[in-house]
Amino acid sequence: MNSKNILIVGAGFSGVVIARQLAEQGHHIRIIDQRDHIGGNSYDARDPQTDVMVHVYGPHIFHTDNETVWNYVTQHAEMMPYVNRVKATVNGQVFSLPINLHTINQFFAKTCSPDEARALIAEKGDSSILEPKTFEEQALRFIGKELYEAFFKGYTIKQWGMEPSQLPASILKRLPVRFNYDDNYFNHRFQGMPKLGYTKMIES
């Protein structure tokens, strides 16, 4: 195979993996990035004062169902098991997220079975919204005003810097509601974080 000079734009996960694969095939690789470091949004570094590992662009938990991907990643870093369990404080009470059966029962002060919880959420939803076009409409249609205002509205404004009425409905489809007691934020089989950080993993 003829060796080629290849320019990779972007030093995040995708860029560095592609670069490594091509380099192992004998190509000459150059990587550029608009930032002055590798790792993309997963870049992390130790705080010099506290020695705490800081995810500079927000927390990242590696999660996948693809065993090939997991095996590839664990060749380059020791992964610490980590399950992301998210809590939210609403009106002085602590709730589990994603919304699950425990969240529903706690919020509405009920002891619903899974089927009863499904029926309750369906009842709370605004059935007059036939084709939701915005995040807000999707939430009101899917989970109703009470859960939307308690768990989604403020968080969404903070995350996106926009009113939910200005965001597309498709965003809410990524936020799960469960009718069991599973409070693991992700459903994937393999979950964890690199022991020495993402930057060290990518450098290897």
Model-derived segments and spans:
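Dinucleotide-binding Rossmann-like beta1-alpha1 core, especially the glycine-rich loop
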Residues: 49-126
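Gly/Ser/Thr-rich beta-alpha loop segments that engage phosphate groups in nucleotides
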Residues: 12-17, 41-42, 199
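Active-site/ligand-binding neighborhood in enzyme catalytic cores
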Residues: 93, 102-204
